[in-house]
Regions:
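Periplasmic/extracellular loop-to-transmembrane helix junction in inner-membrane transport proteins
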Residues: 3-6, 29-70
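N-terminal signal-anchor transmembrane alpha helix
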Residues: 6-30
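Loop-to-helix entry region at the N-terminal start of transmembrane alpha-helices
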Residues: 56-63, 113-134, 177, 218-223
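Cytoplasmic-entry segments and transmembrane alpha-helices of multi-pass inner-membrane transporters
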Residues: 77-113, 126, 137-145, 151
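C-terminal transmembrane helix and the adjacent membrane-cytosol boundary/short C-terminal tail
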Residues: 86, 174, 178, 220-250
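Glycine-rich helix-loop "coupling/hinge" segments at transmembrane-helix boundaries
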Residues: 113, 189-225, 249-250
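Transmembrane alpha-helices
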Residues: 124, 128, 161-193, 221, ...
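Short cytoplasmic-facing helical segments at TM-TM junctions of multi-pass membrane proteins
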Residues: 137-179
Length: 250
């Protein structure tokens, strides 16, 4: 927790303050309860957080965390394989290039028919977004490793899994984390949409339910919660990056 607090640095505080200033200017310009003031929203957010809001945020966080875990378990080995094997790259990369640009959200109805209306369909949707970023990032990271480094490591007596742990994984880790960082924003947006179908838990459901009830203060409290969830995940990635890739900060 102390490490997390240290990473919420002055730049993060500056960003939050600037968003609040722009939000307040928009609030006083429109002069409508459609956009409540930051103060009112934060006050309502704090009141809701110990109960209903935490429940919805945890449901959304669980879906994203499960999708990230599945994507890494599948995407990293596959990315390493096609990065190291030219034949595998020639066979799989064209398929990836065809599927990667497709809007994954369009497949949600298909996932719901095949997997049911529960969490499985929503998690699968997020996996299809994240896994391509991971696969391509790992593959490209492996390809960028100079052959001379493989020779140097081999001359030191390192072989097999040692090459992966001492050379390949450290080389691809910055790209992998960057890919995760990019895909997280898209994933949260897609999850917001997915949680409006056949579910009663999740921050996306909470926001849209508040909108249908014309409760704009609750709606913006949910939007604030969604933003803070994204901030938490991205800050966690920054912490992991500093731990696993300290050389890029020298």
């Amino acid at each position: 927790m102390k490490v997390f607090k240290r990473n919420l640095n002055d730049k993060t505080i500056y960003g939050i303050l600037m968003v609040c200033v722009m939000w307040y200017i928009l609030h006083i310009s429109i002069e409508s309860n459609v956009i409540p003031s930051p103060y009112e929203t934060i006050k309502r957010f704090i009141a809701l957080l110990p109960g209903v809001l935490t429940m919805h945020l945890l449901a959304s966080f669980g879906r994203i965390a499960a999708a990230i875990a599945i994507s890494m378990l599948l995407g990293i080995p596959l990315g390493l394989w096609i990065g190291m094997n030219k034949r595998a790259d020639a066979l799989i990369s064209p398929i990836v290039y065809i599927l990667y640009p497709l809007p994954k959200i369009a497949f949600l109805p298909i996932f719901m028919i095949l997997l049911g209306i529960g969490d499985s369909a929503k998690i699968t949707l997020i996996v299809t977004i994240i896994i391509f970023q991971i696969l391509i990032a790992v593959r490209d990271g492996v390809k960028e490793i100079p052959k001379e480094l493989f020779y140097s490591v081999s001359s030191l007596g390192v072989s097999g899994m040692g090459i992966y742990s001492h050379l390949i994984m450290p080389a691809v880790m910055p790209r992998l984390i960057s890919g995760l960082r990019i895909s997280l924003g898209i994933s949260i947006s897609a999850l917001f949409f997915a949680e409006n179908f056949a579910t009663t838990y999740g921050i996306g459901y909470y926001i849209m339910n508040a909108w249908t009830m014309v409760d704009y203060l609750d709606m913006f409290s949910g939007i604030l919660g969604l933003s803070l969830l994204g901030l938490f995940l991205l800050t966690a990635l920054d912490i992991i990056e500093r731990k696993l890739c300290p050389w890029i900060f020298l």
